[in-house]
Amino acid sequence: GLAKAAKKADREVFEGGLRIITDADTAYIISVSCETDFLANSDKFKAMLDVVAAFLKENGESSRDEAQKLIESNYSLEMGENLQIKQYEIMKGWVVAAYVHSNGKLAAVTVAQVGWDEVKLKQVAMHVTAANPEYLSPDEISEEVVEKEKQIQLEMMKNDPAMGTKPDEVLLKIIDGKMGKFKGEVSLLEQAFVMDPNVKVKDFLGSTK
């Protein structure tokens, strides 16, 4: 079985799924890749994800190699595809909430101090899977990232017939005025909350401890 599974391990993997188990202040996160969407959506693949997540919870992050062997010996041959662990992680916090999208391929975990509303944290995790923020707040965005975005915007404006004739100095002033919007769009707390676009995530959560 393992020899045949080893042959399958040479094949490329493009699909997969993930599973998150939460228990008190800890989240156990695993993702396993496979070759086809058909298998990724099957009940047997989803059942395997449950087993691997439980194995992580029982044995800790250091058991990743053992978990991969478990998959190869018990599932790869039966499923007929190359199955590879892509994520095998434990997250600890005071309050942990997780959301896994219905397709089993998108998920987010929110971790906060004691006192936060777990239901709200789960809704924010749902927001993260939809809005894909890159930072928690604008303060975390480096000047290097901002400068790179400015150059991207500058090139776009130069290629715009209505703006391209203006001097770079003028264009950069216009771009500087747009950086606040850019920072807000990529920062979780400043994003419009997907369940109520009229409020920002930070306002939905209340005080940001």
Regions found by a protein language model. Give the residues of each.
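N-terminal assembly/interaction segments in proteins that build large macromolecular machines
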Residues: 1-209
